[in-house]
Amino acid sequence: MEIPKDEKIKFLKELVEIYSPTGKEEEAAKFIKEKLEEYGVKAYIDKVGNVIGVKEGEGPLILLAGHVDTVPGYIPVRIEGDILWGRGSVDAKGPLSALLFAMVESNANVIFAGLVDEEGFSKGARALDVPRPEYVIVGEPSGVNGVTIGYKGSLTVRFVERVEKFHGSIGGGAAEKLIERWLSISGNFEDGFNGLSGRIVRFVAYERDFEFYGEMIVNLRTPPGYEPPRDWDIIDFVPAYEVNRRSPLVRTFVRSIRELGMKPKLKKKSGTADMNILAPRFGVDAVAYGPGDSRLDHTPYERISLMEYLQSIDVLKNVLTKLKGKDLDKIYKSSPR
C-alpha cells in the first residue's frame, strides 16, 4: 500500500495538534488506533494505554516502538514552508509517524507500539505485552542519516539529612550536608558517553522544632557498567544500553541510508530512551531511529523538516525490506567494519 505524501504530512500535523503530555495520551492513542484500522492493520489499546498495531507479513518479527506522550509546554502548531512546528514534532511524534507509515507501506512482519509515559517512568515500555521480536527499532530523533546505537542510563536517587538542632553560630545543618554530598558526586562527572553526568531535580531544606531537615533528589546519567552504591535510596534506575555496531540490524540501517544517497552516522546519546528497557527485556538487538534534531527536544523551538520526515520513511521501508526473510548473520559475516 502506497500512501500519498500529503496524507503522511496531514497525519503528522494532526497528531502533533493533539496535545498529549505524559498522563494525557488517551486522545492521541485513539487517533493512531483509528488510522491503523483505516489502513487495514489490526489495532487495540492495551491495559496501560499503549496503542498496538499488528501486521502479519514476511520474515522475522520486528517491533517498531515509539512514544505517544510529550513533555509539557504547548507550542502552536503551524507549517512554515518545509517546517512543522509543535510540541512532539521531534520528540517523538515525527519518528512515531515514520514508523507507522513504514509498516503500512511494507509487507514485513511487524508489531507497532505507540507507548505511553516515556517522558515519565516508561510505564508503557515496562508493561508492553507482545510476542518476542527478532529486532527492535525505537522511534527517536537521530536525524534522517543517523542511527542511535547507545543511550546512557538514568538513575534517580533521593538523599535525606536530619540534623539535631543547634545554634546557628556553630555551623552547617542538613542543607550543607546535602551540598557536600552533591559536590562529592559531581566531582566524578566526566564528559562523553562513558562518563557520569547529572543534575539536581529537587532540593528543599527547612527547620523543624528540634531538627534541621533537608531532602535532595538527583538524576544521574550513567555510563555502561555503572552500578550505584547499595545504600542509596534509589527511586528509579534504567541502566545504559549499547548495541554492537557489527549487529546485522545496525549494518542494515547503514546500508539502507547509503543506498538513499546519504552518509550514515552512528550515534551514542547522553539521554535515556525506551530502547534501554525494551532491548534487555526481549534480549535482542535494538537501535533508535527517526527524523528530527534531538537538540530541539523539550525546547520552545521544537520543529521538524517535513522533507526529512518523508525521507526517514523511505529509510525505514528499505530497512524492513532488507530484514525480511534473510539470514543477515551470513550476509554480513565477512563484511568490513
Curated annotation (Swiss-Prot):
Its main location: cytoplasm. Zn(2+) 1 binds at residues 67, 91, 140. One of its GO terms (biological process) is L-arginine biosynthetic process. It holds the Pfam family Peptidase_M20. GO terms for cellular component: cytoplasm. The active site is at 69, 118 (proton acceptor). Binds 2 Zn(2+) or Co(2+) ions per subunit. Its EC number is 3.5.1.130, 3.5.1.132. The keyword Cytoplasm applies. Keywords: Amino-acid biosynthesis, Arginine biosynthesis, Cobalt, Cytoplasm, Hydrolase, Lysine biosynthesis, Metal-binding, Zinc. The keyword Cell membrane does not apply. It catalyses: [amino-group carrier protein]-C-terminal-gamma-(L-lysyl)-L-glutamate + H2O = [amino-group carrier protein]-C-terminal-L-glutamate + L-lysine; [amino-group carrier protein]-C-terminal-gamma-(L-ornithyl)-L-glutamate + H2O = [amino-group carrier protein]-C-terminal-L-glutamate + L-ornithine. Its cofactor is Zn(2+); Co(2+). Zn(2+) 2 binds at residues 91, 119, 298. It is found in: Cytoplasm. It comes from the Archaea. GO terms for molecular function: cobalt ion binding; hydrolase activity, acting on carbon-nitrogen (but not peptide) bonds, in linear amides; zinc ion binding. Pathway: Amino-acid biosynthesis; L-lysine biosynthesis via AAA pathway; L-lysine from L-alpha-aminoadipate (Thermus route): step 5/5; Amino-acid biosynthesis; L-arginine biosynthesis. HAMAP family: LysK. Catalyzes the release of L-lysine from [LysW]-gamma-L-lysine and the release of L-ornithine from [LysW]-L-ornithine. Belongs to the peptidase M20A family. LysK subfamily. This is Putative [LysW]-lysine/[LysW]-ornithine hydrolase.
